[in-house]
């Protein structure tokens, strides 16, 4: 398991290829073109709507920053409207390919496995239009993409790097009321992708441990790469100007919840906590998603039941610029999720100098420095959340509030996309070095060359 850049491991020392051979192959690896796979949600979709969230931001921003290093990036995603053009040139060196696979509308994410063959065919056809060896590496995002990624890896003879973003077993262990468990099909599919991937990229050390304990991943194949934040967009700004733009009074205390409105994200916890704090206003920025679609007005109804409807402002999903303005305007951002592989919203808020109160789950203890840039809450007890929010609000006007605000911005600055891109490229080069060494081993061992590539090492997963 590696954090950021590092030397290649020694897994090849008994296979006819010396460790220093792998190190040399890694150092010599050249990344010219990358195929990014994002089957279930487009990087061009507005975060906070449907299935769009932090992963969308991650895929798009990593592609843009790789392109700034002179690397060509093609992102493959499923077309969801007949008006989607086959190819969208997002920026120099970055294009999105909208692959037609299944109906444009009305296809639930849980039905997408039925369309993976069609999606894979579209990906392979796109590559077939180029000269052999067009892509140097495949990077799949989420397990559905990983299923297509390992097929492309074998067809193109290039390494597969995979980022899970979330794991079914982790989500199922922390289900919120009203959320349906992830199906066994996904658990099996995730195990297959973990077994097949040449390298696995995770957001945090905690996620790496989960991959190892749940899916028996090889620690030597895991790279820890923290997501980045756009520090040009998310930076400290004028609070009063932002409040005027949003119609907020200069003196009122304001808490924000930003994200998809679904049980997993627990926006109801914030409303119930704020209901215990007289005079505190809450801004909810986001749209219903997942099981939240079953009751799109549920949060507004809850505000009515709690008697705080006049203190709740609902905003649609925000563009990055508008989201930064929301962060500038509020006193703190609340993130009470039951499960969160990282928590990009937490870092974006802190980059604006806004403190965060977050659940101590998943990657949030990495995204938020407890007692320094914000507060972490263990569990989802409403009284504890009310106390945590009240404590930060009371310190707002004093020296402690200003100190935490500066600390928040300083902490967020360590999560730049430049650092993320450096770590991604290091992982890509390791994957290419290991993959090349593996192919050389096959040439030296004719018996191994006749074996299926990875099937002999596969582990089954019970439902």
UniProtKB/Swiss-Prot annotation:
Disulphides: none
GO terms, molecular function: acetylglucosaminyltransferase activity; D-inositol-3-phosphate glycosyltransferase activity; magnesium ion binding
BP terms from Gene Ontology: mycothiol biosynthetic process
Domain of life: Bacteria
Enzyme Commission no: 2.4.1.250
Catalysed transformations (reactions): 1D-myo-inositol 3-phosphate + UDP-N-acetyl-alpha-D-glucosamine = 1D-myo-inositol 2-acetamido-2-deoxy-alpha-D-glucopyranoside 3-phosphate + UDP + H(+)
Keywords: Glycosyltransferase, Magnesium, Metal-binding, Transferase
Gene3D superfamilies (UniProt xref): Glycogen Phosphorylase B
Spans annotated as Disordered: 443-463
Residues the record lists as binding Mg(2+): 327-328, 330, 354
Binding site for 1D-myo-inositol 3-phosphate: 40, 51-56, 109, 142, 166, 186
Residues that bind UDP-N-acetyl-alpha-D-glucosamine: 46-47, 54, 260, 265, 318, 340, 348
Subunit record text: Homodimer.
Family affiliation: Belongs to the glycosyltransferase group 1 family. MshA subfamily.
Cited function: Catalyzes the transfer of a N-acetyl-glucosamine moiety to 1D-myo-inositol 3-phosphate to produce 1D-myo-inositol 2-acetamido-2-deoxy-glucopyranoside 3-phosphate in the mycothiol biosynthesis pathway.
UniProt-listed HAMAP family: MshA
Protein name as catalogued: D-inositol 3-phosphate glycosyltransferase
Species classification: Bacteria, Bacillati, Actinomycetota, Actinomycetes, Mycobacteriales
Chain's gene name: mshA
């Amino acid at each position: 398991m590696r954090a950021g850049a590092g030397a290649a491991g020694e897994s090849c020392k008994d296979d006819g290829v010396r460790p220093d051979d792998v190190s040399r192959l890694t150092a010599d690896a050249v990344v010219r073109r990358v195929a990014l796979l994002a089957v279930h949600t487009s990087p061009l979709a507005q975060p906070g709507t449907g299935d769009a969230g932090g992963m969308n931001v991650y895929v798009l921003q990593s592609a843009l920053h790789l392109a700034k290093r002179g690397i060509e990036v093609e992102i493959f995603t499923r077309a969801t409207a007949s008006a989607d053009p086959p190819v969208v040139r997002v920026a120099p060196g970055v294009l999105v390919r909208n692959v037609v696979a299944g109906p444009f509308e009305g296809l639930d994410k849980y039905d997408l496995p039925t369309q993976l063959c069609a999606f894979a065919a579209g990906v392979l056809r796109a590559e077939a239009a180029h000269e052999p060896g067009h892509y140097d590496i495949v990077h799949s995002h989420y397990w559905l993409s990983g299923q297509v990624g390992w097929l492309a890896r074998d067809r193109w003879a290039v390494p597969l790097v995979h980022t899970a973003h979330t794991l079914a077993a982790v989500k199922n262990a922390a289900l919120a009321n009203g959320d349906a468990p992830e199906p066994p099909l996904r658990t099996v599919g995730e195990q297959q992708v973990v077994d097949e991937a040449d390298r696995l990229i995770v957001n945090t050390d905690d996620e790496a441990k989960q991959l190892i304990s749940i899916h028996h991943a090889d620690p030597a194949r895991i790279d820890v790469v923290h997501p980045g934040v756009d520090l040009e967009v998310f930076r400290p700004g004028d609070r009063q100007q932002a409040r005027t733009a949003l119609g907020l009074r200069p003196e009122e205390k304001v808490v924000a919840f930003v994200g998809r409105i679904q049980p997993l994200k627990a926006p109801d916890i914030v409303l119930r906590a704020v209901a215990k704090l007289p005079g505190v206003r809450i801004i909810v920025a986001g749209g219903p998603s997942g099981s939240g679609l079953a009751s799109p007005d549920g949060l507004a109804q809850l505000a009515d039941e709690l008697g705080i409807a006049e203190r709740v402002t609902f905003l649609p999903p925000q563009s990055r610029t508008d989201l930064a303005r929301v962060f500038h305007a509020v006193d703190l951002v609340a993130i009470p999720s039951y499960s969160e592989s990282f928590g990009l919203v937490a870092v974006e808020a802190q980059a604006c100098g806004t403190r965060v109160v977050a659940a101590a789950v998943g990657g949030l203890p990495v995204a938020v420095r407890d007692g320094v840039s914000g507060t972490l809450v263990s569990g989802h007890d409403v009284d504890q959340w009310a106390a945590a929010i009240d404590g930060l609000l009371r310190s707002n006007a004093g020296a402690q509030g200003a100190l935490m605000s500066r600390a928040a911005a300083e902490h967020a600055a360590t999560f730049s996309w430049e650092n993320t891109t450096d770590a991604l490229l290091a992982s890509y080069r390791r994957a290419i070095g290991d993959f090349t060494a593996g192919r050389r081993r096959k040439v030296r061992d004719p018996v191994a060359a006749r074996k299926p590539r990875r099937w002999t090492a596969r582990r089954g997963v019970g439902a």
